[in-house]
A protein has these predicted regions:
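Beta-rich, blade/repeat-based domains predominating
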Residues: 134-145, 178-189, 219-232, 263-275, ...
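A short beta-strand motif characteristic of beta-propeller blades
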Residues: 125-131, 169-175, 210-216, 255-264, ...
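Surface-exposed, short loops/turns at beta-strand junctions within beta-sandwich domains
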Residues: 83-90
Length: 352
């Protein structure tokens, strides 16, 4: 049985090296200022904070005070607020004051909100191994029935393909133009979406892998991973601490999650998969898979998948873990990597 201390060290090994981010925004000043107690560099979901208003530069008495974080009302208990049902990461507490003479002023103060709990550590068990094209620099992986849709990368080598891991039959394999570096892919509302890395463009294909539409990125500068929740939410990673929510029809970036443990913000969520109500993210340059709460960005678990790469053919091109697809009928995950000769069917297990 793994001790709590060893679990924390292993979590650090699987996540460490991902750039944690500091909140360095300034506090806007208006007709009043606010103090937050306790004074801390970071807070956690579930914390209760006491808010006091100082140095009012307006006439009249305060009649009403309201609080928001990320345009969402915050639970209040008198002069206290409770950090619950909120997005994590670098946020702003917005305090609005209305006086008895009808005037209203608002100030904002930055808050760093982290997850409430330490991520759970999970392991894996291999059920089956299947051949995988060792020339495929895997960037995206998702099932349609028993067919895998796979996006591959590298300039002059990128492609979008459909193949069956059980029969090894390749149904279609369409190369991208040499100027594009293929990235994550997902199957959404009958269409196949594929990102590119730094070309600021995504492709929308029909089931015959013909391009029917393209879309541009917004604030994000790169395309990494892509998945959806099965109904109306698309998620896109870009290598930063953010996972972007895309509009289900235009694919424009409309909001974002920030990835947090109870210790820090984290970056480098790579290829994405949505399964069982969670986002599963390959961690770039690490043998770990993050399990992310799509409602707030909390990293709730980390799957230690060390050892898989040791089981593939050692070639000069073999690269990092990347590629995770959930088979909803078999209730298993299929995992591979860039230029790996195998794809592994696994289940994840609690690390008791």
């Amino acid at each position: 049985m793994m001790t709590p201390t060893r679990q924390l060290l292993l979590l650090a090994a699987l996540l460490l090296g991902l750039s944690s981010c500091k909140h360095n925004a300034t506090t806007p000043q208006d007709a009043f200022s606010i103090d937050i107690l306790p004074k801390k560099k970071e807070y956690h979901l579930g914390d209760t904070l006491q808010i006091s208003i100082h140095h009012p530069r307006f006439e009249g008495s305060v009649q009403q005070t309201s609080y928001q974080i990320h345009q969402q009302p915050v639970t209040t208990l008198g002069d206290k607020i409770v950090l619950e049902n909120l997005l994590l990461g670098k946020q702003f507490l917005s305090v609005s004051v209305q006086t008895n003479d009808g005037k209203q002023d608002t100030v904002k103060k930055p808050l760093l909100i982290l997850a409430q709990h330490t991520p759970k550590l999970l392991s894996y068990r291999i059920l089956n191994e299947y051949p995988h094209d060792k020339e495929a620099y895997t960037q995206g992986l998702e099932f349609i029935g028993d067919t895998l849709v796979e996006s591959t990368g590298q300039y002059k080598q990128s492609s979008i393909r459909k193949w069956n891991p059980f029969t090894e039959e390749v149904y279609q394999n369409v190369p991208l133009q040499p100027i594009y570096f293929g990235e994550g892919a997902t199957v959404f509302r009958g269409k196949i979406l594929q990102l590119t890395w730094r070309e600021n463009i995504g492709f929308v294909y029909d089931q015959q892998l013909k391009v029917v539409k393209t879309f541009a990125y917004g604030k994000s500068k790169e395309g990494w991973g892509l998945c959806h929740n099965g109904t109306d939410k698309l998620y896109k990673s870009d290598g930063t601490e953010k996972i972007w929510l895309l509009h289900p029809e235009t694919f424009a970036e409309i909001d974002s999650l920030q990835l947090c443990t109870d210790k820090s913000l984290y970056t480098y969520a790579n290829e994405l998969e949505f399964a069982n109500g969670k986002i599963y993210a390959n961690t770039f340059l690490k043998d770990g898979i993050m399990i992310i709460n799509p409602e707030n960005g909390a990293i709730e678990g980390v799957v230690d998948v060390r050892g898989l790469k040791d089981k593939v053919e050692k070639t000069p091109d073999v690269d990092v873990l990347n590629g995770i697809a959930y088979h909803p009928i078999r209730h298993t995950f299929f995992i591979t990597g860039k230029n790996w000769s195998k794809i592994f069917e696994v289940v994840f297990l609690p690390n008791d």
